[in-house]
Amino acid sequence: MARTKSKPRKRTTVRKARRSVKRRTTTKGTKRKTAGDPVTKAKRGVATSSPFAAHHAVRMNPFSGATTQPKIPDGGFTSSLSRRLQNVVEVTNASNEGIMHLVMAPTMGVPICVTHTTEGASTRSGATLKPSYLGFLGQGVGLETKVGGVIKWPIANTDTGDVINAADFAKWRVVSQGLQITLNNVDDENDGWFEAVRFNWRNDNEDICLTSLDGTDTGNVIGAAPNLNGLPLLTANIVEMPGYKSGLLKDIKDYQFMLHPQQTRHDPVEITKSIDFVGGTDLNYDTQSKKANLGDSAAGTLLKQGLVDQNMDWMYIRIHPRSNTGAAGQTGSKLICNYIQNLEFAFSPDSDLATYMTTNRMDPKSAKINDQLNNNQDAANKKREFN
């Protein structure tokens, strides 16, 4: 009898028991992450910004709101106090006048002069240039002239007295300074164009004058302003000058003008409490332009040295406005000037403000910021480049 072949035994699969995983829970319960959830990176310490970043932001953009107490953190002062001076003024080209000349300078109190304006034609009708002076009234910076111990302005060319530093600071310097202009005309009357260049000042006494901060001819608080009489740039061909910019007046709102440092080291300007003057020699008062021109004398030079930050360059803007004949639709170009000057001071020990000064700490990047600014020769840059 034949043997039968045995069948192989069928193996049964044994499944291992699944190990339970304990999920983490929070007080709000368990939440499973989905594909749309953000990925959380492990913390390796909280990054902090440099304590000097806000100061450098204002140096690169004068209108920056990073801080209202901007400094140049280079250790140039042991301690200092900063001020942010700003004003907005509208100027219009005078009737039957041509080109408007605007100069912005690093001067104390009145940083801008613009010629051939309606205000200049009204207040200074006898002056050839019919200038307007744009200053910072009521912002804690200014000078006074005293004759016989009494404040007097305007002065006479026969007076003898003192120019008093009313703010009582011993040293100062410009942290940054800028200007924004907007054409305030309707679309049908927005023609006109502008040219702009930056230039190195020739360091001449006659380029500086003293005038009222409020732009009038009688305000007792005065400041140093650029004096455009005799400035060669007004009649020069500026197209070939470094940094030349031009454009339409309707587009000038897109630009920002600012002064640049001329070197990597920015020394403070020293100013004395009081400087004696002799009328007609140290200060020559011009009854037509309502200003006192600095004389070519020792006192005139001392005033110039204490009232101008010579570490900064100057700005010249030549404006070709719409004609102003006084007729309907021919009333010229209305320009809104928003100008700012960020200053750093060191006050005299006997000043009440001396106790508010804080340490000027040094950041090695300060010189690099200066170099970065003065490497840019452009007289104007688009506002978006400052953001």
UniProtKB/Swiss-Prot annotation:
GO cellular component: host cell nucleus; virion component
Domain of life: Viruses
Residue ranges, compositional bias (Low complexity): 370-379
UniProt keywords, alphabetically: Host nucleus, Virion
Main subcellular location: host cell
Motif (Nuclear localization signal 2): 30-37
Subcellular location: Host nucleus; Virion
Region of interest (Disordered), ranges: 1-47, 365-387
Motif mapping: Nuclear localization signal 1: 8-15
Compositionally biased spans, kind Basic residues: 1-33
Biological role: Self-assembles to form the virion icosahedral capsid.
Name this polypeptide is given: Capsid protein
Organism annotation: Chaetoceros protobacilladnavirus 2 (Chaetoceros sp. DNA virus 7)
